[in-house]
Amino acid sequence: MAIHLYKTSTPSTRNGAVDSQVKSNPRNHLICGQHHCGKGRNARGIITVRHRGGGHKRLYRKIDFRRNAKDIYGRIVTIEYDPNRNAYICLIHYGDGEKRYILHPRGAIIGDTIVSGTEVPIKMGNALPLTDMPLGTAIHNIEITLGKGGQLARAAGAVAKLIAKEGKSATLKLPSGEVRLISKNCSATVGQVGNVGVNQKSLGRAGSKCWLGKRPVVRGVVMNPVDHPHGGGEGRAPIGRKKPVTPWGYPALGRRTRKRKKYSETLILRRRSK
């Protein structure tokens, strides 16, 4: 991804750094509308997730996470922008005439061919079961449940690594640093997700953040005591506590939020690194 810096004529362009624009011309049969109800509200209209609202209207692109077009070669026709994710997407024309969107693998260019199946070459963009991959393979779009489609390592620049295979399970190291077991029959795509430099972007101004549907974040220390435990005081007062807390009084730093007794507890060999 190429980072584009604007000429420093205004404060917003002086601090902004955006990626080079990848145009989007979605196919009608591969898009559908979205109905965002409430933007962070529940069925009663009460805010359950803060700092959400507004944003530009979006059309959802139907992404093929299952990669179930077995042994049919496809060609990358376009690389497009998707407003619903930070990774780019590719339009694939398959040999049987079908057209699908997939996540753009890093390094893939227009004209490359891809295929999914059981005995396909270990090539960037190809999808195959973990049992057919050699150890050390970099993968993304990984299934957790067989046939459900990829659910892990789908963000821009995400990549996991196949580190072991034993019995019916394969051991993966995920982008978060977590090491967990997954069935060897689950499929994954070879390579890394594209748009690696997405973290180098700087929106530069508040309006760009609002376009993404993210509302301003107000610090608790500038609120009133009725609104936040950090609020109140005369002038610029400290929070008045040993440690910061959330608006509901729970510890804000270091508290583990993962639920106990989850089904995947026995599958996780090492927790993600912080």
UniProtKB/Swiss-Prot annotation:
Main location: plastid
Entry-linked InterPro entries: NA-bd_OB-fold, Rib_uL2_dom2, Ribosomal_uL2, Ribosomal_uL2_bac/org-type, Ribosomal_uL2_C, Ribosomal_uL2_CS, Ribosomal_uL2_dom3, Ribosomal_uL2_RNA-bd_dom
GO molecular-function terms, A-Z: rRNA binding; structural constituent of ribosome; transferase activity
UniProt keyword Cell division present: no
PROSITE patterns: RIBOSOMAL_L2
Any one biological process term the GO annotation gives: mitochondrial translation
Region (Disordered): 1-21, 225-274
Gene3D superfamilies: 2.30.30.30, Nucleic acid-binding proteins, Ribosomal protein L2, domain 3
NCBIfam families cross-referenced by the UniProt entry: rplB_bact (TIGR01171)
Family: Belongs to the universal ribosomal protein uL2 family.
Protein name, UniProt field: Large ribosomal subunit protein uL2cz/uL2cy
Gene this protein is translated from: rpl2-A
